[in-house]
Each structure stands twice: as C-alpha cells, then as structure tokens.
Amino acid sequence: MKRFIIGISAIILLLFIGFVAVFYGGFYVDSGRDNHVNTFVRTENKEILIKDKDEWKPFEVRGMDMGSGIPGEWSTDYAITKETYLHWFQLIQEAGANTLRVYSVQNPSFYKAFYEYNSQHEEPLYLLQGIWVNDYIQNSRVDAYADSFAGKLLDNCLVTVDVIHGKRLIINNDADTSTGLYLHDVSKWVLGYIIGNGWEDTTVAYTDEKYPDMEPYKGTYLTASKDASAFESLLAETGDKMLHYESTRYDEQRLISFSSGNATDPFDYPKEIAEYFRKCARIDTEHITATDKFISGQFASYSASPYDQDYFSCMEYTTWNSLSDKKIDFSDCITPDGKRNTYRAYLRLLNEHHTMPVLAVEFGAATGRGEIQENPVTSRGLGYYSEKEQGKILVDCYEDIMAAGLSGG
C-alpha cells in the first residue's frame, strides 16, 4: 500500500510539473517542420485574404474595439462576464461588424464566450488580438531596449500566442493582461496580432536618439531594413521572435501589425507644424520587411480618431502632397462649397505611403456630457453627442476610411 501511495503521488507530482511547464512556463518541443506551417489569412499587395475552403477571398475588416471595463469596475479588474460578452457579440454582429479588436489579453470568460459564440454561428466573428506594454513602463525613464520594456513586451507576445491557442495559465501579469486559466483554442478565428497600443512618442524618440547607429535586426521571419531606426529594429525583433514561437510550437502563422498613430506617423512635416504639435517621433513599418518564411504577412494599423491632432488643418491644401513621394489625388477631399475633409485626406496619405494593407484600428465619437476636443475642420469631436449623432459620425468616418483606400477599420 505504501508503494502504491508513493507511486500515485509521484505520478500526480509529475503531471503537476508537466502542467506548470506547459501552461505556465511555455515549455514545448520544436516540431522542426518549418515547411508545414499553416495559415488561413494572408495579405496580397494591399488586400487581406481569408481562405474559404480552397479559395482565397478578399476580406474587408468591419471592426469594433472592445475594452475591458464596465461601469462601476476598474478596467484592470476584467470584470465582464461570459453572458455579457455573448450578448454583446450578438449585437455587434447584428450591427454589421465582422471583427473584434481587443487591446490586451482579456479574462478567460471572453475567450470562452468567443469560442461558444463562433461555434454556434455559421458566420463567425474574427479577432484582432492586441498586445501592449503598460503606461507606467512606457512613461518611465528607460529606453525601449531596457528589459522592463523590451523583455516585458516579448513576454506578453509569447503569452498571448498561448492564450489564443488555449494553453496558458496567467497568475500575475502586472495588469498588462487579465489572469486565469485559458483552455479555449480560438486561433482559427484570430486574424492577427496588433503589437502595441499607441507608443509613447517621447520613448520612441529617446530610443532612436540613444542608439543612432544600431545595426538593423536580421531575423528568420522579419528583418529591419537599412533605413530602420533603433525602435523599428526592436519591433522587427519582437515580431520575429513571436512568429518563431507560434510557427514552431503550433505550426501556425497569422497576420502581424505594429500599432501607430498620428503622434508617431512616418511623415516629415514642415518645421512649424512639427513644433506646434510637438511631433518628435516617427515609426515606419515599411522599414520592417518579411522573409519568405513569413507566409501570412503584415498590415499597417493606425489609431485614426477624428478628433486627434490634425496636421492637415494647419496646412494649405496645395501643400498636402509635399508629404509624399507620390502625386496623390485629394480632389474628393474638398466639398463643392470649399470645405476640406482633412480626415479623409490624412487617411489617403497613410494608405498611399504603404505597400501593405492599412487598417484604421481605432476611431469613433463619444456620447459623454462634456466635449474634450473637436476637430476644427470636420467638427467631429470627443463627447457631447446623442447616440444618433454618434452613429452618424461613425458612418461618416467609415465612409472616409474606405474612400481613402484602406482595408477597413
């Protein structure tokens, strides 16, 4: 009997160690089958394509951002229930959206609800899974190559891969993500990853100034070009290691993107404009290129809120083209009565700059009692709208997004 108890105890201990190693430590054995990596989504020139049986079909992203907070709870408590998520998913799909975007790993209830909802619907919702570094780290004194920044970002990337495949235990992650046991594999509905959520421009600028002569990163899946800055090279390295992890552990790939916004857009503005808006940093994902081993592809993602700082409103219409190497047609950005649609014009500039698909991953209008800011040209602001007015602004923004040539938003 004593030997039996010892034997059972040893088996339980080994199972526990194995569980912790796989679900908490990320332990796996490399399959070594690089030529067997699969994907159901890829890019081709400026289009996103989804595999439907044996046919690749263009996919227009009609998305909705989803935060982690509800009234009466801190967003970092991740307090939304499965039942609430299921109700929201139904409403979101009825509104015409086909994609969700979340900023970080949500609570296990989200992935359980997402799995359950899609398993019961012929037309699924897709997911763009975000990964971030928290604001405390981004606004600290360190540059992006400090372990508290680069190391934490990479850790979050690898944890996120395990989460969407239903193989992760998160005990404590400094509020960067929720916690819990993730057992639902939702990977077949995950279009891709968006790394970052609005990089702090001063951190980007500080990193680039500190390492002006850094050798560009050369990876297996992603490579930084000779023109890449130090921060862009860090992004290439992070994305490359994330792709390696998913490719070798799960034999899968999906799209990848590095978030940006107008504070870090790739354009070189006139001196007076840059000084007025305190524009100090640039991120150009065209400086991050894919190798043949990255079969899914990249897309460019921008926060494109209509009330954000509007460089074009301070520039003459005739000077907009000075920001591009191409001759861009902005004629439909001027109404018959002479009003300028600087929102559409800026999005077109972004789209024409890139060789990859471009998504506006964050835009909208709020219904709060007070208005924080308003675009002086388009009169689209943040707050003080009725729900009807809010809906009209959302429709107008989306029409501008598609008219500018983006792949959705």
Regions found by a protein language model. Give the residues of each.
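Acidic-and-aromatic substrate-binding clefts and catalytic sites of carbohydrate-active enzymes
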Residues: A79, R101-K112, A263-F267, Y307-D310, ...
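Aromatic/hydrophobic pocket-lining residues that form the small-molecule binding cavity
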Residues: Y85, Y111, L153, C157, ...
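Membrane-interface motif at the C-terminal end of an N-terminal transmembrane signal
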Residues: L15-D34, D310
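Active-site-adjacent substrate/metal-binding segments within catalytic domains
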Residues: G26-S119
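Active-site region of glycoside hydrolase catalytic domains
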Residues: Q120-I334, R348-G370, M402-G408
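Short, acidic/polar
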Residues: W74-I92, E272-T291, K388-Y398
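Histidine/acidic-residue-rich catalytic or RNA/ligand-binding cores of hydrolases
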Residues: R369-S379
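N-terminal Sec-pathway targeting helices
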Residues: M1-F16, V20
